[in-house]
From Swiss-Prot:
It comes from the Eukaryota. This is Thrombospondin-2. PANTHER family: THROMBOSPONDIN (PTHR10199), THROMBOSPONDIN-2 (PTHR10199:SF10). It comes from Homo sapiens (Human). Pfam families: EGF_3, TSP_1, TSP_3, TSP_C, VWC.
Length: 1172
């Protein structure tokens, strides 16, 4: 027993030194790459094998490579086993291209090989690099990238590359070279799923990705449950087997039977034969290494045998070890029925028995015997005919069978034995080639240049023989020939003459002279050894041989520039004067083009801009802030055709302004300096040169901006960034605006309870109980919660003896609320002319039902031009002029006055149309008079800051003075609107949940742009707010109104009103005026006959949101009826009416509108006149 264990140890020890153990023949690539559920970018899923995780990779830059030690083992085994198997279960995304396995390095972007499933091409590509040359082998129609699970087996063995999907062989191909012999592990990295580029990463799921060695493809498929259809043939020994595959130290001398063959032409290319020689050289080295290893193992075994004493029969004698048994020298034994082996000098030599042909049709095989035998008697040959010739071999290549037959006369003989004999036959070896695509050979060297000088061509070729396409493989793609230009030495160029020059002028005009001409040898010049031109460079001849006549022009009788003609008799005549002169040719005078063509040069004033010269003319440069040409010419024709054109500069149009990218360039005209201004777009604030974000749309940025020097307006950080407060009031200077400060005066009393919000009064004393503290009450002892102070002297109207401050006590003042020291009262009704709504008609009650500022006693509502002023009070009754501008105060409005400033210069020629300047002084000649330069209406507000630069009655936006118009004045259901004024009239807040009402300003407009910020600072109620324009009376105006939610008005009389959410544009033309009818018609979204007509309603029905800032912009052009309403939410357009045309009213006043909605902020209000 001990002896057997020793022998077993001797057998195992050398075998374990020769290669890897079984556990090293299969590598789990996920395991040796340390890929698990914690790996960044690897998502774990459930695959077909529930016991093993499947992975999808999303971050390929985090995929770890195979462990370096394992990679070294893998590359070593690949070289030893001459290939590998890659098995995996995969689910590849449809039509994607993904890498299964790749080995890269030693460089950063260098790859040694990769296996890629190319979904778009439906191929499995094996790409490998040898000596910098890229090789690609593709298996076609693989069907992997279809988003279905596949069980794949990729085999790279020897020179074969094949793919099994499931149990089916899909395709196989021959490799040009065994690339695995060149693989390097040092400084290299092996990756699963990671491609060389982003588009080559594997997209899908992977499971059970293994590299397998030692096994055959049949074993691997068998483990996967596949049936072995030809398993017996794989290991069978045929007659063509040249050497038996035995143990590592067992040799064989068996050579199968040979058959005579005719010489065949070599079907292999030179490159293939070269590869074969290279492989044989490598095999020779490997065999030598194995032989040396085997000798060392034998020596080690001999030493062990001597050490332990060895078996008696084998000691000091030759012996062989085979199949766990010892055989003595020259001992012969039977391996199987057809193989015998003999021990000779420690080597086992085996022989295969060759069987003779059977002499019968159905030979029998006896157990234990190798060859078949025929069972018949010796006397069976009697009666048979001679054997026929052998048939053709049953196969065309490889091993097959042949038969021959004989006949017997059974009437006279028993004829024992077979009538047919069978024997084996062996033809030429079968063609085992597989389909392969053609490949180009290397390019041949370039040929010599096709010319010896100048430009020629060189050519190189390549052949489609590396390899040659076979078995239906594809031909090479591309051209087999390349040609490119080559440059030889320059060729010699002979010189040639240029054409003769024209003849020179004759040296004399008569009596014979000389003229000459020349030529040059430059067409071309002689170069590179070429010949020079042959002939003369110069040629001469006689000229003007006639006799000289008497010349009357020798005395220069004509004006310079006029042609003189002489005659044989000595007389002469002069031609016409030169261009730019007038005369008979003898005497010529300068032509004054500037006087004859007065509009040659551009002119904006009386200053001449055309300069006459002798001869000709030229224009001065265009005036400042104009650009154009500067003609220069001679003669009347040039003056008529080459006129000067100067156009005003427009930096906004020319894109030469320096406004911020989020600002709008506004052109002010070429007379202004600067000619434009910059305004930040909605959602931004700043000085226009720099703009920052403005969340609450009140014109102040969220953060401080670094604006230009001394430009602080709209550049300082908003002190209430989430609540519109365009005035930025901050009474206590704590950096928090009053609008969002809970205690504006820091007296410890919150604003909601403070009776003096802007004055420190912690004691809250209020003597008159009007909820206004004594410290801030302008009438501390008189109840006056409204705190009205008409003359702004600090004393409230309720306790003032002179409300308007005109030094006339109230009880004697016929206009107690209007300053009028003269106390004029034309109609004697006790109401002074300054405040009388009918100054020429006696009406002491001053009733004004339609709120148009014209008393009912004198209001006839006859207005032929629809500008809001009845004909007998309109200063241009037949021309619409809602603003009633009259700068010379002559009672005739500017719209119909041919001389607005009454300076004697008609408007169409007046360089200051609105300012008296009869001298029309314009020093810079730009067409704008000096007296109105940069301030056209002379109101002391520069045009760049003037909201109406052509109306001195309006200079800035101001709603501090407004008319409150209740639209439903009767009843006590709700209270009237309560308006709070901020920011010098540029911000109004309506605090009450009120009846419909308007706060309308007193400025009147024709064409106008009106914008403002809308904000509801409460979550209570959901009704209407908006603005009015074109206001002429409480029965005639346009209104833009916005409802938060759809709602039916709670009073269904006199008409039922349905209000839909969203922005509406309506025109009011009420026959009843203020009251219930107009109230319900305003609430209703749609048309109400005799009251309201809806021009547009936002089809998206988007209502306003609580605590959200919106910015509206109105454009109104009464001459064309153009109306457009634009509403922004932040920087985005929320509603846009687009162009709406309506000419019901030709202008009017602007105002703000509310209907049953409290805490509405109207901030950063801005109106601007547009002279259109």
């Amino acid at each position: 027993m001990v002896w057997r264990l020793v022998l077993l140890a001797l057998w195992v020890w050398p075998s374990t030194q020769a290669g890897h153990q079984d556990k090293d023949t299969t590598f789990d690539l996920f395991s040796i790459s340390n890929i698990n559920r914690k790996t960044i970018g690897a998502k774990q899923f459930r695959g077909p094998d529930p016991g093993v995780p499947a992975y999808r990779f999303v971050r390929f830059d985090y995929i770890p490579p195979v462990n370096a030690d394992d990679l070294s083992k893998i590359t070593k085994i690949m070289r030893q086993k001459e290939g590998f198997f890659l098995t995996a279960q995969l689910k590849q995304d449809g039509k994607s291209r993904g890498t299964l396995l790749a080995l890269e390095g030693p460089g950063l972007s260098q790859r040694q090989f990769e296996i890629v499933s190319n979904g778009p091409a439906d191929t499995l590509d094996l790409t490998y690099w040898i000596d910098g040359t890229r090789h690609v082998v593709s298996l076609e129609d693989v069907g992997l990238a279809d988003s279905q699970w596949k069980n794949v087996t990729v085999q790279v063995a020897g020179e074969t590359y094949s793919l099994h999907v499931g149990c089916d062989l899909i395709d196989s191909f021959a490799l040009d070279e065994p690339f695995y012999e060149h693989l390097q592990a040092e400084k290299s990295r092996m990756y699963v799923a990671k491609g060389s580029a982003r588009e080559s990463h594997f997209r899908g799921l992977l499971q059970n990705v293994h590299l397998v060695f030692e096994n055959s493809v049949e074993d691997i498929l068998s483990k996967k449950g596949c049936q072995q259809g030809q398993g017996a043939e794989i290991n069978a020994i045929s007659e063509n087997t040249e050497t038996l595959r035995l143990g590592p130290h067992v040799t064989t001398e068996y050579v199968g039977p040979s058959s005579e063959r005719r010489p065949e032409v070599c079907e292999r290319s030179c490159e293939e034969l070269g590869n074969m020689v290279q492989e044989l050289s490598g095999l020779h080295v490997l065999v030598n290494q194995l032989s040396e290893n085997l000798k060392r193992v034998s020596n080690d075994n001999q030493f062990l045998w001597e050490l332990i004493g060895g078996p008696p029969k084998t000691r000091n004698m030759s012996a062989c070890w085979q199949d766990g048994r010892f055989f003595a020298e020259n001992e012969t034994w039977v391996v199987d029925s057809c193989t015998t082996c003999t021990c000779k000098k420690f080597k086992t030599i085996c022989h295969q028995i060759t069987c003779p042909p059977a002499t019968c049709a159905s030979p029998s095989f006896v157990e234990g015997e190798c060859c078949p035998s025929c069972l018949h008697s010796v006397d069976g040959e009697e009666g048979w005919s001679p054997w026929a010739e052998w048939t053709q071999c049953s196969v065309t290549c490889g091993s097959g069978t042949q038969q021959r037959g004989r006949s017997c006369d059974v009437t006279s003989n028993t004829c024992l034995g077979p009538s047919i004999q069978t024997r084996a036959c062996s033809l030429s070896k079968c063609d085992t080639r597989i389909r392969q695509d053609g490949g180009w050979s290397h390019w041949s060297p370039w040929s010599s240049c096709s010319v010896t000088c100048g430009v020629g061509n060189i050519t190189r070729i390549r052949l489609c023989n590396s390899p040659v396409p076979q078995m239906g493989g594809k031909n090479c793609k591309g051209s087999g020939r390349e040609t490119k230009a080559c440059q030889g030495a320059p060729c010699p160029i002979d010189g040639r003459w240029s054409p003769w020059s024209p003849w020179s002028a004759c040296t004399v005009t008569c009596a014979g002279g000389i003229r000459e001409r020349t030529r040059v040898c430059n067409s071309p010049e002689p170069q590179y050894g070429g010949k020079a031109c042959v002939g003369d460079v110069q040629e001469r001849q006689m000229c003007n041989k006639r006799s000289c006549p008497v010349d009357g022009c020798l005395s220069n009788p004509c004006f310079p520039g006029a042609q003189c003609s002489s005659f044989p008799d000595g007389s002469w005549s002069c031609g016409s004067c030169p261009v730019g002169f007038l005369g008979n040719g003898t005497h010529c005078e300068d032509l004054d083009e500037c006087a004859l063509v007065p509009d040659i040069c551009f002119s904006t004033s009386k200053v001449p801009r055309c300069v006459n010269t002798q001869p000709g003319f030229h224009c001065l440069p265009c005036p400042p802030r104009y650009r154009g040409n500067q003609p220069v010419g001679v003669g009347l024709e040039a003056a008529k055709t080459e006129k000067q054109v100067c156009e005003p500069e427009n930096p906004c149009k020319d894109k030469t302004h320096n406004c911020h990218k989020h600002a709008e360039c506004i052109y002010l005209g070429h007379f202004s300096d600067p000619m434009y201004k910059c305004e930040c777009q909605t959602g931004y604030a700043g000085d226009g040169l720099i703009c920052g974000e403005d969340s609450d749309l009140d014109g102040w940025p969220n953060l401080n901006l670094v604006c230009a020097t001394n430009a602080t307006y709209h550049c300082i950080k908003d002190n209430c960034p989430h609540l519109p407060n365009s005035g930025q009031e901050d009474f206590d200077k704590d950096g928090i605006g009053d609008a969002c400060d809970d205690d504006d005066d820091n007296d410890g009393v919150t604003d909601e309870k403070d009776n003096c919000q802007l004055l420190f009064n912690p004691r809250q004393a209020d003597y008159d109980k009007d909820e206004v503290g004594d410290r801030c009450d302008n009438c501390p002892y008189v109840h006056n919660p409204a705190q009205i102070d008409t003359d702004n002297n600090g004393e409230g109207d309720a306790c003032s003896v002179d409300i308007d401050g005109d030094d006339v006590f109230n009880e004697r003042d016929n206009c107690p609320y209007v300053y009028n020291t003269d106390q004029r009262d034309t109609d004697g009704d006790g109401v002074g002319d300054h405040c009388d709504n009918c100054p020429l008609v006696h009406n002491p009650d001053q009733t004004d039902v339609d709120n148009d500022l014209v008393g009912d006693q004198c209001d006839n509502n006859e207005d032929i031009d629809d500008d809001g002023h009845q004909n007998n009070q309109d200063n241009c009754p037949y021309i619409s002029n809602a603003n009633q501008a009259d700068h010379d105060r002559d009672g005739q409005g500017d719209a119909c006055d041919p001389d607005d400033d009454n300076d004697g210069v008609p408007d169409d020629r007046d360089n200051c149309r609105l300012v008296f300047n009869p001298d029309q002084e314009d020093l810079d000649g730009d067409g704008r008079g000096d007296i109105c330069k940069d301030d056209f209406d002379n109101d002391n507000i520069p045009d760049i800051d003037d909201v109406c630069p052509e109306n001195n009655a309006i200079s800035e936006t101001d709603f501090r003075n407004f008319q409150m118009v209740p639209l439903d004045p009767k009843g006590t259901t709700q209270i009237d609107p309560n308006w709070v004024i901020r920011h010098q009239g540029k911000e109004l807040v309506q605090t009450a949940n009120s009846d419909p009402g308007i706060a309308v300003g007193f400025d009147e407009f024709g064409s106008v742009d009106f914008s403002g910020t809308f904000y509801v600072n409460t979550d209570r109620d959901d009704d209407y707010a908006g603005f009015v324009f074109g206001y002429q009376s409480s029965s005639r105006f346009y209104v833009v109104m916005w409802k938060q939610v759809t709602q039916t008005y709670w009073e269904d009389q006199p008409t039922r009103a349905y209000g839909y959410s969203g922005v509406s544009l309506k025109v009011v033309n009420s026959t009843t005026g203020t009251g219930e009818h107009l109230r319900n018609a305003l609430w209703h979204t749609g048309n109400t006959p005799g009251q309201v007509r809806t021009l547009w309603h936002d089809p998206r029905n988007i209502g306003w949101k609580d605590y959200t800032a919106y910015r509206w912009h109105l454009t109104h052009r009464p001459k064309t009826g153009y109306i457009r309403v634009l509403v922004h939410e932040g920087k985005q357009v929320m509603a846009d009416s687009g162009p709406i045309y309506d000419q019901t009213y030709a202008g009017g006043r602007l105002g703000l509108f509310v209907f049953s909605q409290e805490m509405v902020y109207f901030s950063d209000l801005k109106y601007e006149c547009r002279d259109i």
